[in-house]
Amino acid sequence: PKTLDLMDKPVIAMVNGVAVGAGMGMALQCDLRIASEEAKFSTGYVKVGLVPGDGDAFFLPRLVGIAKALELLWTGDFVEAREAERLGIVNKVVPAGDLRQYTGELARRIADGPQIAIRMMKRVAYQSLRLDVRTHLDLVSSHMAVVRETEDHKEGVQAFKEKRPPKFTGR
């Protein structure tokens, strides 16, 4: 869990099939999760008398709320892809044949964006889970001061004025 937690770049999970226990935990650690219609999820640990040790008990309540998370942890029930999407476990469900293409296109759209701002968005979004709103807004202001000085910001503003797509460089 620490490796993905420390990554400042967006991390996208692509789930095509069954994700149980550590497999589900690894997907939950990612920033976004895209699943095929055939995907199924289960924490599974209760079935073998274990406590989730890979982040399920940390990430799941943040995505689905404490009561639903406890239900899934205590029962080990499987959640089908569409229900996982409805609950917020996955961001999007697509046909199995489209999974790789859809996920690749999403990753490309994010990678083509202003990378300094995207990394800061990730940081402040996760930090907001531990902060009060006033502290969060102060943090966002300090990050805003940094990104306003980037070439990507200047390019974004210029592209907006010229009514064209921006060409970000990550600087």
Q: Model features per residue range: what roles?
A:
Residues 127-128, 163-167:
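A short structural micro-motif
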Residues 135:
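Conserved "HGTGT" condensation-loop signature of ketosynthase/thiolase-family condensing enzymes
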